[in-house]
Amino acid sequence: MEDHQHVPIDIQTSKLLDWLVDRRHCSLKWQSLVLTIREKINAAIQDMPESEEIAQLLSGSYIHYFHCLRILDLLKGTEASTKNIFGRYSSQRMKDWQEIIALYEKDNTYLVELSSLLVRNVNYEIPSLKKQIAKCQQLQQEYSRKEEECQAGAAEMREQFYHSCKQYGITGENVRGELLALVKDLPSQLAETGAAARQSLGEAIDVYQASVGFVCESHTEQVLPMLQFVQKRGNSTVYEWRTGTEPSVVERPHLEELPEQVAEDAIDWGDFGVEAVSEGTDSGISAKAAGIDWGIFPESDSKDPGGDGIDWGDDAVALQITVLEAGTQAPEGVARGPDALTLLEYTETRNQFLDELMELEIFLARRAVELSEEADVLSVSQFQLAPAILQGQTKEKTVTMVSVLEDLIGKLTSLQLQHLFMILASPRYVDRVTEFLQQKLKQSQLLALKKELMVQKQQEALEEQAALEPKLDLLLEKTKELQKLIEADISKRYSGRPVNLMGTSL
């Protein structure tokens, strides 16, 4: 018998309510009785004496049976003056709380209510808070990862921006202005390149001419015409290259004014056309308006193909064609349009110049290889009749000339000059380059802003976690207290046998 008293009673928490109902510790209709009790508690707490402990019991927690017992004990002290000789209290406060306790003890309603609170906390409230805290921790990790990605991305885009600016030869403070300034300096850079070519290409051209003339018996004027011209006259204008005479006047195009000038011309021609059409329309109205004579054109002229609005339209078209033709023509000795550009500025002549440089560079590179090899009897006999300039060439001289040519080709084909040439050929290209570079900087700024947003969201998630953790700790404490109260109450009903509520995981 004693061994039986020490056998514990194990109850699954999820089935605690069913266990109490099955063993008739409480009624099936306990929920309706609990609702009545809650209404009476809500009414009773409206009239309570001033007590710090009572206020603490009533603030922020679910009031259950054991709270009511404690409140009743406190009221016995505050309402002692209302106690009569029979040991009863005339105070309405005492009567209200005594009634609440009596309702709780009816059919053990307090026990099933406590069990319901325990099951709800274990199955729903505690897992929900833990899930929210885990979500906050996950968000913090995700926001931290995104913060690092945004920081790295912003630094990379900023580095790409400055690297691209370095390739263009600008600092990036004012992209458009710096590019236009470089384009303005482009003629002087090309003039220096032309001067360097003029000074350094003489011997190389002579060697190539002599070699072609010796091997192919080709006329010297057919060899590298552009390089020969630059070697004699430098980086002159296209007009001088095309005509052979130096222009008396050079009218260079203005880069910045070109798009605005085109837009203004288009607007002017549009206004002229509108005026012409409006005048023709006015004349047509005057001709139809009851024969009114405006003193400008006779009414009969409106039917003549050479008069009124039709004549004005033809004149407008003829005038437009005349102006366009005048824009493409230039007087004798005046370099205008592409003719006003230098050989290295104009695309076609610059490409020809580069082609001839590469042709000369390939020839000299091959010649340097031949000079580095041991000469056989056949080659020696062949070059006995060659010009003196060919016989006097050495490997060192040839390699030096190749190095000079490679340097010139590298300058003219550099990425910076390529973009400047494109801007020179199409002024709108500077806007495209500016937009391209600014886009990298904007992306860097957007990533920096996104990084700040990730920091803010990470802080918000941290604050939310800090607010949830005390709630979870308090709920765990209250749930453990409920578990102990329920286990102790059930143990009393079974002669003090130990009771274990299983599955709480607290």
Curated annotation (Swiss-Prot):
Motif position, Shuffled ATG8-binding motif 3: 310-313
GO molecular function: ubiquitin-like ligase-substrate adaptor activity; ubiquitin-like protein ligase binding
UniProt keywords, alphabetically: Cytoplasm, Cytoskeleton, Endoplasmic reticulum, Isopeptide bond, Membrane, Nucleus, Phosphoprotein, Ubl conjugation, Ubl conjugation pathway
Keyword Endoplasmic reticulum appears in the UniProt entry: yes
Per UniProt, location of the Glycyl lysine isopeptide (Lys-Gly) (interchain with G-Cter in SUMO2) cross-link in this chain: 450
Motif (Shuffled ATG8-binding motif 1): 267-270
Spans annotated as Required for interaction with UFL1 and mediates interaction with CHEK1: 269-506
Sequence similarity: Belongs to the CDK5RAP3 family.
Subunit structure: Substrate adapter component of the UFM1 ribosome E3 ligase (UREL) complex, composed of UFL1, DDRGK1 and CDK5RAP3. Interaction with UFL1 anchors CDK5RAP3 in the cytoplasm, preventing its translocation to the nucleus which allows expression of the CCND1 cyclin and progression of cells through the G1/S transition. Interacts with ATG8 family proteins MAP1LC3A, MAP1LC3B, GABARAP, GABARAPL1 and GABARAPL2. Interacts with CDK5R1; competes with CDK5RAP1 and CDK5RAP2. Interacts with RELA. Interacts with CHEK1; may negatively regulate CHEK1 and thereby stimulate entry into mitosis.
Domain notes: The shuffled ATG8-binding motifs mediate interaction with both ATG8 family protein and UFM1. The RPL10a-binding domain (RBD) anchors the UREL complex onto the ribosome via association with RPL10a/ul1.
Protein name: CDK5 regulatory subunit-associated protein 3
Gene: CDK5RAP3
